Amino acid sequence: MRWLGIDHGDGRIGLSISDELACLAHPYQTLQSDARVLAEISRIVERERIGGIVIGLPKNMDGTLGQSASKAKAFGDELARAIPAAKIIFWDERLTTVEAQRALRAAGKNTKQSKKIIDQVAAQILLQSYLDSLQWEQRGAQ
C-alpha cells in the first residue's frame, strides 16, 4: 500500500509519497493551502493509488497539542470526509522542519532554493518516520 505524507501549514502543504512496498518516502509536491487543496489531494490519492495518509501533528515539546495541532486535526477531519476510503493517521512531527532545513543545508541548498521544497522534505521525514515504525512493528510480530 502506498502512503501520502502531509506537512500541513497555514500557507503551504508539503506532500511526500511512499513506494509501493511502504519502505521509502520521497518528496512529492508543495500545494498552496487554499480552498482547492482537498480536491487536489483527492486527485493525487486516486492517481497514485494511495491507501493511507499520514498527517503531521505538530505537538509542543512537552507533548501537548497547541493551535497548530488543532488546525492539523481539523484538516485531517476534512480530508477523511473528502476521501473516506483512505486510512488517516496523525503522527508526531516535532522538529521535522528543523531536520528538513539541516538536510537541505547539508545538500548545499540555499534559503531561496530550500523554500520551494522544505515542506516536501518535512513531509518526507514525517512519512519516513511512520514507515520505519511500521517496519519495526512487523519485525516485532515475527
Kindly label every feature range from the protein language model:
Residues R2-I6, D10-G11, S16-Q142:
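Phosphate- and other anionic-substrate recognition elements at nucleic-acid/protein interfaces
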